[in-house]
């Protein structure tokens, strides 16, 4: 019996020696992941009578939290560096570097994903098939959202959604915060294919960029993560209306209602902000290196000018900057000068300049980006008395050769919207007309 046992043990050792355990990838596992941002904890909390004890009941995983999901991949770039590639409908955004380390207290593996060009990151602990941590926006006080992710999950909201019983393809007239003092109009632009849904919401101050989600039964869900914002739209059909709630991270939510429309309306972007003076708009602000720059400098004399009212924290502003850079590359002109006046969340000069410097470098912006003030509408409005206030970030000012404001474009309809192509044509026509003027 002992000989038999020894023989079996020998065979087991030999078999084990022939098996090669796959080497765990050093870092996050490449491939597809599903991430969630936890907006609310739905676990029931019960106070035990007569005791100072809190008991949290255990519920199924899919009911523990109210979340905003998104999809991403871990890929390698040409330098063999790991990249965090976020997917929202037709857009893919790449963020890097991804840094790794060890928690000195527990020995757990840690990760840190830089979300440049924004002043934000995701950090936490990782295992071969899961991540757990927080999304942190550094230039917003105490802004942190719990984050989790699972490897190999390719669905967004539901793995096996109920068959769609509604069709929301097309355009919808939307009102956010109806009957409140802060109500604002929007247009929903949706493309539905069975359960799959993508689209965006346009407003008079900008769009919500690329949204992706589903239609399940009579319910509609859309989400987006772009490195700066976490958006979730949770709605359902109620008769002929679409009713829901828009969540921006954990700090803002507003109800909305929409009706299908073949001709939805928003105020035209060039009529929202009014020009109230023809006095030349001239300024002098620090650039990212601390040098004073003025549009009144002789080297800019007799040129038409575009002035961006912008901020490094603003995704719509980023879209606008990318458009302007593309236009300048395709249409170089010695008669046009561009300036970006950045209004930053950091109140401290050095921090704001560092933020602008990093943003400009990451975006490869080749025109001056100047520190103009603090990120709010009042701060921006105060430096431009020639108009009746700044209504949105971004806002674009068009100046003639005398530095007079001749047109104001409020907000930005980016590449996720149906209006992007017409905006590009309008922009080109405006520049052409200004260059012709002497």
Ranges and model annotations:
Residues 293-324, 339:
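Short active-site neighborhood of thiol/selenol oxidoreductases, capturing the structured segment around
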Residues 15-17:
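C-terminal motif of bacterial Sec signal peptides marking the signal peptidase cleavage site
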Residues 27, 34-122, 126, 158-159, ...:
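Central antiparallel beta-sheet cores of small beta-barrel/beta-sandwich binding domains
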Residues 319-364, 375-383:
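Structural microenvironment flanking redox-active thiols in thiol-disulfide oxidoreductases
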Residues 364-368, 387-397:
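Structural micro-motif
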Residues 261-297:
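N-terminal "domain-start" segment that seeds a small globular fold
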């Amino acid at each position: 019996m002992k000989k038999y046992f020894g023989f079996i043990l020998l065979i087991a050792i030999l078999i084990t020696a022939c098996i090669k355990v796959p080497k765990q990838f050093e870092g996050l596992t490449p491939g597809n992941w599903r991430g969630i941002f936890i907006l609310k904890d739905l676990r029931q909390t019960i106070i035990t009578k007569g005791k100072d004890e809190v008991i949290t009941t255990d519920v199924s995983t899919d009911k523990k939290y109210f979340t905003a999901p998104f999809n991403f991949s871990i890929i390698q770039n040409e330098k063999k560096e790991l990249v965090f590639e976020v997917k929202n409908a037709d857009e893919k955004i790449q963020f890097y570097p991804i840094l790794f380390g060890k928690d000195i207290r527990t020995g757990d593996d840690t990760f840190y994903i830089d979300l440049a060009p924004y002043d934000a990151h995701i950090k936490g602990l990782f295992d071969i098939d899961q991540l757990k941590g927080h999304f942190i926006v550094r230039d917003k006080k105490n802004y942190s959202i719990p984050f989790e992710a699972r490897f190999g999950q390719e669905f967004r909201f539901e793995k096996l959604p109920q068959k769609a019983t509604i069709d929301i393809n097309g355009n919808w007239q939307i009102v956010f915060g109806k009957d409140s003092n802060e109500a604002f109009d929007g247009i929903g632009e949706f493309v539905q294919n069975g359960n799959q849904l993508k689209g965006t919401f346009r407003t008079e101050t900008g769009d919500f960029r690329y949204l992706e989600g589903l239609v399940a039964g009579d319910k509609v869900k859309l989400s987006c993560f772009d490195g700066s914002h976490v958006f979730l739209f949770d709605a359902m059909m109620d008769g002929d209306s679409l009713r829901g709630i828009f969540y921006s991270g954990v700090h803002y939510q507003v109800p909305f209602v929409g009706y299908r429309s073949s001709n939805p309306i928003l105020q035209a972007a060039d009529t929202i902000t009014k020009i109230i003076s023809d006095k030349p708009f001239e300024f002098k602000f620090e650039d990212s290196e601390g040098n004073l720059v003025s549009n009144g400098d002789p080297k800019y004399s007799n040129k038409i000018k575009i002035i961006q009212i912008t901020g490094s924290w603003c995704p719509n502003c980023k879209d606008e900057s990318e458009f302007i850079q593309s236009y300048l590359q395709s249409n170089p002109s010695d008669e046009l000068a561009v300036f970006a006046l950045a209004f930053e969340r950091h109140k401290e000069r050095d921090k704001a300049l560092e933020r602008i410097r990093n943003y400009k470098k990451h975006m490869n912006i080749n025109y001056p980006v100047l520190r103009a003030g603090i990120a709010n509408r009042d701060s921006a409005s105060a430096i431009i008395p020639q108009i009746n206030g700044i209504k949105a970030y971004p806002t674009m000012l068009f100046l003639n050769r005398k530095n007079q404001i001749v047109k104001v474009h409020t907000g930005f309809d980016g590449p996720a919207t149906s209006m992007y192509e017409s905006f590009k044509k309008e922009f080109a026509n405006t520049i052409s007309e200004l260059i012709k003027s002497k």
